A protein has these predicted regions:
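Conserved class I S-adenosyl-L-methionine
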Residues: 42-54, 153-174
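Conserved SAM-binding loop of SAM-dependent methyltransferases across substrates and taxa
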Residues: 52-65
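Conserved SAM/SAH-binding beta-strand->alpha-helix loop
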Residues: 74
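S-adenosyl-L-methionine
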Residues: 84-113
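A short SAM/SAH-binding and catalytic strip from SAM-dependent methyltransferases
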Residues: 116-135
Length: 174
């Protein structure tokens, strides 16, 4: 909601950290690019939820769409997403529209407004618990996504270290 914190899931502090960490994150972006290169959505329209500045979004994947509607609550997200990806996408003729909106809260309406679009949740579902702070409600809302998105091409990516863990380590070959 404000420029510094953006509701605890973004803001100026986050974007400065993300910008400074680009090199360190590049192997993850490369793995995501390899995975997404195999994904073949049946549409040219993408609803990108939680886009932030697109720090984790491979440009080659974004370029596969003719239209992208990017949603984020962070007041800096649209400007920084355009800074990172806008020129490249414009050159390719991709129509990019940024929306400052809580897409999770209005997802059924957005799906009706964009009936042919596929949906990608970019580092947003794992943060839902920090915004809502009621674990039972979060679990209920995330479980409802299966019904809400039924019949729709959709996917999600999120880092593992966004919240408390049970202390187990990840398998090295994940």
């Amino acid at each position: 909601r404000d420029l510094i914190h953006a509701g605890g899931t973004g803001g100026l502090n986050w974007h400065l950290h993300a910008h400074q960490s680009r090199q360190r994150w590049q192997p993850t972006v490369d793995l995501l690019d390899q995975f997404l290169s195999q994904v073949r959505p049946q549409t040219e329209h993408l609803l990108l939820v939680g886009c932030s500045a697109g720090w984790m979004m491979p440009p080659s994947w974004l370029a596969r769409f003719e239209r992208i509607d990017a949603y984020d609550i962070d007041p800096l997200a649209a400007t920084l997403f355009h800074w990172r990806h806008g020129r490249h996408l414009r050159k390719l003729g991709v129509q990019l529209t940024a929306h400052r909106q809580d897409a999770l809260a209005t997802l059924p309406d957005l799906l009706q407004q964009h009936p042919q679009a596929c949906v990608w949740f970019d580092n947003v579902l794992g943060q839902h618990r920090f915004r809502v702070r009621d674990e039972a409600r979060v679990e209920q809302e995330l479980a409802a996504l299966q019904h809400t998105l039924k019949g729709r091409n959709w996917g999600s990516v999120h880092d593992v270290y966004s919240g408390p863990t049970d202390g187990r380590t990840l398998a090295k070959d994940w």
